Amino acid sequence: MNEPLYRLVYISRNEIKGDDATVLGEIDQILASSRIKNPIANISGALMFNAGCFAQVLEGPHDDIQNCFERIQCDPRHSHVVVLSFEPTAKREFSNWSMAYLGADSTASAKFGGIMHESGFDAELLKGERIFDLLKEHLLEAESNSL
């Protein structure tokens, strides 16, 4: 029996300190760990990062998403973790990725930085759907460009 799918969208502040190489090394560790653990937990998703913030979409069974998110909340590389949405979903939008990534040099990340600046990191002004749509649009574009 298939468990119902859920989608969680959150943002957090980046607490990784150091030069660009140090920060990118930490991001690589996050991605490597996620790409190993997420398929085992039946989680797919996407991470977006710029120097100041993370945004992430996680898709999968409710309890698995919740367990993964609890680990994220305890990770010292994140602070001010805010859930923008956590809802049932009919299908996965990031099924091809255990953890897709849009880095600080991407167009999406620049737009994300603008959204975060515009909102003043105020969760009341941010919408999970806006972050989700931004990630989806740019990952699908990147995927089609790589074909």
Predicted regions and their residues:
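Charge-rich, low-complexity N-terminal segments
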Residues: M1-L147
